[in-house]
């Protein structure tokens, strides 16, 4: 006796002979600890493929975000030359032509890591994976329209199993604009007031009582009390404290008593501000500078001499110095030997003149 439920399952397997192979191919290389979802009916076959791929991608690439269900491309299985595989392929093509929800086979190109390995086996980095690691590529485009499926044939040495998904996501990639950090914002926004400290200082001070009221007894009675009622709010640039008395202007008045100790101790302003004249050091007198040597004694009447030495010699001669050099021919005395020699050479010697017959004596 045949059960109606078993007959229904047999009929479904005949119509879709690759449904069991799809579930087996998706779970062949997965660890035993991962729960494999049960095969789904043909209406939900596309969602089942996306769920199995998401489980495999979460195991192989734990740090990458998963794509949306409509962005995963389907994969076709290569056919063999045997009769059984050709029959199965023709049956699957016929089923895919008449059934829009037909489930294609899924095959994992990578081997998952085993517990004996120290490090997980990951594919080499590529430019496509670098693009997937960007924040904009990880955002799933669930709100956009569903794109048609694209068939991709995998090669054994290719590092990225989903190039079509990356190309689709790079075309419709949104512009990623990072928000400014809190530390980069200007600090002027945290101030409660918009005025600068300098503007706070320039605000006028208003007093309820007239200033300098507790110091009225210090000043003389001749002081006009109307000055105390001056409106100081008209001078905002120079605020004054009410407890500081004004300076005594009598010290700066021009009428100062000469007998006051301040006037007596103050020095003469002309002596303080007189320019200092530089004093040049004494220089030795030259022959051209100074008075001309003259002799006013011995009846010379101011005779001039070319040098001071000649004047001294003249004085010694007039005062009767002792004769040291005497001419042998005429007996004339001289104070210097040079004068005696010059006396002979110039022909002034009387004895020489006599010998030559020049003189009359």
UniProtKB/Swiss-Prot annotation:
Coiled coil: none annotated. One of its GO terms (cellular component) is nucleus. A zinc finger (C2H2-type) spans 325-345. Residues 73-92, 183-204 have a biased composition (Low complexity). Keywords: Metal-binding, Nucleus, Translation regulation, Zinc, Zinc-finger. C2H2-type zinc-finger transcription factor; part of the gene cluster that mediates the biosynthesis of the antifungal antibiotic FR901469, an inhibitor of beta-1,3-glucansynthase, exerting antifungal activity against the pathogenes Candida albicans and Aspergillus fumigatus. FR901469 is a cyclic depsipeptide containing 12 amino acid residues and a fatty acid chain. Positively regulates the expression of the FR901469 biosynthesis cluster genes frbA, frbB, frbC, frbG, frbH and frbI. GO terms for biological process: regulation of translation. This is C2H2-type zinc-finger transcription factor frbF. The keyword Magnesium does not apply. GO terms for molecular function: zinc ion binding. The keyword Protein biosynthesis does not apply. FR901469 inhibits the activity of 1,3-beta-glucan synthase from Candida albicans and Aspergillus fumigatus. With minimal inhibitory concentrations (MICs) against Candida albicans and Aspergillus fumigatus of 0.63 ug/ml and 0.16 ug/ml, repectively, FR901469 displays greater inhibitory activity than other 1,3-beta-glucan synthase inhibitors such as, WF11899A, echinocandin B, aculeacin A, and papulacandin B.
């Amino acid at each position: 006796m045949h059960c109606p439920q078993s007959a229904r399952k047999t009929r479904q397997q005949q119509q879709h002979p690759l449904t069991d192979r799809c579930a087996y191919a998706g779970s062949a290389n997965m660890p035993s600890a991962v729960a494999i979802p049960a095969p789904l009916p043909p209406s939900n076959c596309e969602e089942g493929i996306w769920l199995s791929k998401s489980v495999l991608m979460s195991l192989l690439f734990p740090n990458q975000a998963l794509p949306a269900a409509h962005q995963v491309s389907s994969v076709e299985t290569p056919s063999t030359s045997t009769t059984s595989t050709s029959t199965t392929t023709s049956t699957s093509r016929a089923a895919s032509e008449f059934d829009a929800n037909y489930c294609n086979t899924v095959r994992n190109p990578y081997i998952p890591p085993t517990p004996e390995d120290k490090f997980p086996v990951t594919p080499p980095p590529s430019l496509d994976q670098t693009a997937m690691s960007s924040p904009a590529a990880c955002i799933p485009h669930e709100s956009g329209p569903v794109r048609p499926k694209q068939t991709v044939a995998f090669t054994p040495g290719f590092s990225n199993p989903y190039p079509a998904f990356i190309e689709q996501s790079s075309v419709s990639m949104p512009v990623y604009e990072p928000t400014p950090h809190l530390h980069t914002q200007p600090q002027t926004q945290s101030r409660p007031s918009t005025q600068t400290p300098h503007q706070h200082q320039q605000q006028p001070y208003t007093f309820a009582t007239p200033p300098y009221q507790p110091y009225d007894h210090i000043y003389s009675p001749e002081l006009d009390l109307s000055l105390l009622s001056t409106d100081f709010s008209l001078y905002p640039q120079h605020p004054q404290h009410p407890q500081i008395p004004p300076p005594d202007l009598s010290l700066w008045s021009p009428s100062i008593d000469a007998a006051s100790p301040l006037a007596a101790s103050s020095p003469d302003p002309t002596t303080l501000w007189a320019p200092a004249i530089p004093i040049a050091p004494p220089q030795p007198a030259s022959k051209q500078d100074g008075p001309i040597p003259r002799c006013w004694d011995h009846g010379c009447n101011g005779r001039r001499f070319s040098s001071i030495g000649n004047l001294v010699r003249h004085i010694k001669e007039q005062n009767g110095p002792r004769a040291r050099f005497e001419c042998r021919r005429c007996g004339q005395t001289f104070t210097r030997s040079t004068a005696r020699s010059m006396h002979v050479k110039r022909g002034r010697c009387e004895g020489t003149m006599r010998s030559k017959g020049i003189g009359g004596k």
